[in-house]
């Protein structure tokens, strides 16, 4: 594939993603908090700091991996980096493979660091890149963490995608052992299982982003790029973010879990944190805001999102993220069926 074709693919991904609509209903609607009428705290008591063994984020939301590798996507990364700088959010760039192949593309990613020199930035590579390239991806952005995306359904629907996955787990293990910053194993919208969590724990992984279905749908994106658009029947493949978080419950004391995939509102973010996530990522909401409404409007959107999270936490009498994990939740019969059939232990305080 030529560099021009790769740039074209990056642009197609963004165009199709922006055209996708948010789901009217999701599994976040199938879980409810129990309301208690009189909080014992005030809004000003709320601490939204997200703390993991290696990373401290001012807020438990971040701009998740999206793009880079073309002139248009450079402009997107530039604007998102300004939003991150002005709001204090962490930001992940999209796959840096284009820059690792072609130095001319590096600035489509490094613009994020240029615009946000003091901010927290995650670099991003695939599970098949050599260790040396993973190290290079971290150095490229002076990144505080490295996402490794695992996207086998996307690759298999992508006309020119990868068809070989046998070496992925061993390669991830090699990268984790060599890279000095936290390595986050990130799904791309298909969710994670307890079996995967076991395998990742065995090779020393300390961070995951479950990225469940419900947000940007890469099966649909790649199917749109197929000549016959003949794999639409896979549109609903995978676990939702709620199901994925429940799958991680037994591993949350050893692995820091981030949540993304289909988060629409501050309440969805709070529900993710209550299920054990340390932070929550969003992609398309930020992309649509910054492209359709500009930087200032997107900054205001983030600030409002944060204030709404504080209001919800006050209603829940939760001063911090850890308090949220002790709050009472009622699940729908459908979610309870998943929990029972998958033999998940979700005992809560």
Curated annotation (Swiss-Prot):
Pfam families to which the protein is assigned, alphabetical: FMN_dh
Catalyzed reactions per annotation: isopentenyl diphosphate = dimethylallyl diphosphate
Entry-linked InterPro entries: Aldolase_TIM (IPR013785), FMN-dep_DH (IPR000262), IPdP_isomerase (IPR011179)
Binding site for FMN: 65-67, 95, 124, 186, 211, 216, 262-264, 283-284
One GO cellular component, as annotated: cytoplasm
This protein's UniProt keywords: Cytoplasm, Flavoprotein, FMN, Isomerase, Isoprene biosynthesis, Magnesium, Metal-binding, NADP
Record bears the keyword Chaperone: no
Keyword RNA-binding assigned: no
EC category name: isomerase
Main subcellular localisation: cytoplasm
Residues reported in the UniProt entry to bind substrate: 9-10, 95-97, 154
GO biological process: isoprenoid biosynthetic process
Molecular functions per Gene Ontology: FMN binding; isopentenyl-diphosphate delta-isomerase activity; magnesium ion binding; NADPH binding; oxidoreductase activity
Domain of life: Bacteria
Subcellular localization: Cytoplasm
Enzyme Commission number(s): 5.3.3.2
HAMAP family: Idi_2 (MF_00354)
Record note on quaternary structure: Homooctamer. Dimer of tetramers.
Name of the protein: Isopentenyl-diphosphate delta-isomerase
Gene that encodes it: fni
